[in-house]
Amino acid sequence: MTLQEKQLGQLRPIDSTAASLYSPGAGVTAIIKTLFIVNTSTSDVTFRVFMDDDGTTYDETTAIFWDVPILANSTVELSSFLAMNNSSGNLAVRTNTGSSLTFTAFGAEV
């Protein structure tokens, strides 16, 4: 079987509250391969990424990236191989400055 990659989710948080970027549907196994974070503001910003396999806890216990700086008007590409197969699970993101970052996840669903 050939995996067909696609955009799994895109989010531009309006505040500094963590929010779900992607959650697999029931019966779906997802592989998240790439996460792009784009800073479209003129200020340096930090971001966090969380992976809660079975819920919505977005803190130190589910963090996979924590307070990573991203320069103004720049892009960060994170390559990974994150598997998700629980429809209650979430890949979530957070920024310290609302309306500054756009997060886009690419991968495959099987």
Where are these regions (language model features)?
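Carbohydrate-binding surface patches
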Residues: L35-N39
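Short beta-strand elements bearing conserved aromatic residues within extracellular beta-rich modules
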Residues: F47-V49
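C-terminal interaction-tip segments
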Residues: M1-A30, T34, G55, R94-V110
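Intrinsically disordered, low-complexity Pro/Gly/Ser/Thr-rich segments with frequent PxxP/GP/PP motifs
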Residues: D53-N90
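Short, basic and Ser/Thr-rich N-terminal targeting/leader segments
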Residues: I31, S43-V45
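Short linear sequence motifs
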Residues: D15, T40, Y58-D59
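Short, acidic/polar linear motifs in exposed loop/turn regions
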Residues: T40-T42, T97
